[in-house]
Swiss-Prot record:
Region (Disordered): 258-327
GO molecular function annotations of the record: structural constituent of ribosome
Cleaved signal peptide residues: none
The protein's name: Small ribosomal subunit protein uS2
Cross-referenced PANTHER family: 30S RIBOSOMAL PROTEIN S2 PROKARYOTIC AND ORGANELLAR, SMALL RIBOSOMAL SUBUNIT PROTEIN US2M
Recorded superkingdom: Bacteria
Family: Belongs to the universal ribosomal protein uS2 family.
SUPFAM superfamilies: Ribosomal protein S2
Length: 327
């Protein structure tokens, strides 16, 4: 395996990954991944020791998918994630849904493919118009094209079902996860303290609301995918330096030259059973005692907990026992 991106606990803290929701909004199934409850803010603090291990495991899975020339679909339709998901998926030559998940996008792929062909046809008609359409007709065509582009633009070149999903916010994207489970497509997802872990094969506990945290995770995934592409190109004898700096674009030109074993069945068989919940809801988080005078300030505040002032918060060190302060 090639070199996966390296991260430390401090990197996660600086990205605000540790910040959970208000304690009253938690999902008990997330208890194993919660360090405790902040003494003054009444928000859950995610155990970054577990996040670090599970992040590496998830990145290893995505690396293997891409190394076998599989497709990864980024899914994040919430406002905070939309632009980041599109940018990072595009940067690593993968696919995304960032506007709205259409029911049946995976389970009814033939119909979706037909809609993609309509999108291409609309673009052809608009671009090659030689006076056969009036301005009003062109506006109507462009409106239909725009609607299809928002929903399908990120998967128009996918050419088939993805081999893995990377999901931001499992509560919002539950339909996508359910469809992936039906088709035994592995799901990698960011799980916040209010998330439902059911159906997620490779969970990554973390803040799924902060732009900074979402950007951190998406960049980690895109960097991993690019590393897998570099490794595949190198093993195929491709001179990466000669191809230029755009590794993803270079890869697209060589991906169809050699056949690889499909990875969807392989990964699904090797991962946890879809829909299973290997979590311990009976275990609840304890209150973390911290000293606000000795501890470092929380680097970020949650957009949905705006009433909690970030400058008053402190973070317990995930690397030491409960009750210790981050010096």
């Amino acid at each position: 395996m090639g070199n996966l991106p390296e991260f430390s606990i401090r990197d996660l803290v600086e990205a605000g990954v540790h910040l959970g929701h208000k304690a009253g909004r938690w999902n008990p199934a997330m208890a194993p991944y919660i360090y405790g409850v902040h003494k003054y803010k009444d928000i859950h603090v995610i155990d970054l020791r577990k996040t670090l291990v599970l992040l590496r495991d998830a990145l290893s899975v995505l690396y293997d998918v891409v190394l076998k020339r599989g497709r990864v679909l980024f899914v994040g339709t919430k406002v905070q994630a939309s632009n980041i998901v599109a940018e990072e998926a595009t940067r690593c030559g993968q696919y995304y849904v960032n506007h709205r998940w259409l029911g049946g996008m995976l389970t009814n792929w033939e119909t979706v493919s037909s809609s993609i062909r309509r999108l291409v046809e609309f673009e052809r008609l608009i671009n090659n118009n030689e006076g056969q359409f009036t301005k009003k007709e062109l506006l109507m065509l462009d409106k239909q094209r725009g609607k299809l582009e928002r929903s399908l633009g990120g998967i128009r070149e996918m050419g088939g079902l993805p081999h893995a999903l990377f999901v931001i916010d499992t509560n919002k994207e539950h339909i996508a996860i359910r469809e992936a489970n039906k088709l035994k497509i592995p799901v990698v997802a960011i799980l916040d303290t209010n998330s439902d872990p059911g159906g997620v094969d490779y969970p990554i506990p973390g803040n799924d609301d902060s732009v900074r945290s979402i950007d951190f995770f998406c960049r980690a995934v895109s960097r991993t995918i690019l590393e897998a592409i570099r490794s595949d190109l190198a093993s195929s004898g491709v001179n990466i330096a000669a191809k230029g700096s755009d590794v993803a674009e270079s890869y697209a030109g060589t991906a169809a030259d050699a056949g690889h074993t499909p990875v969807s069945e392989t990964l699904s068989a090797g991962g946890p059973t879809a829909g299973a919940s290997p979590y311990i809801p009976e275990v609840g988080p304890s209150v973390v005692e911290v000293d606000t005078h000795k501890s470092a300030a929380l680097p970020d505040s949650r957009p949905n907990d705006a009433d909690v002032p970030a400058e008053d918060g402190v973070l317990p060190d995930p690397g030491v026992a409960d009750g210790a302060a981050l010096e």
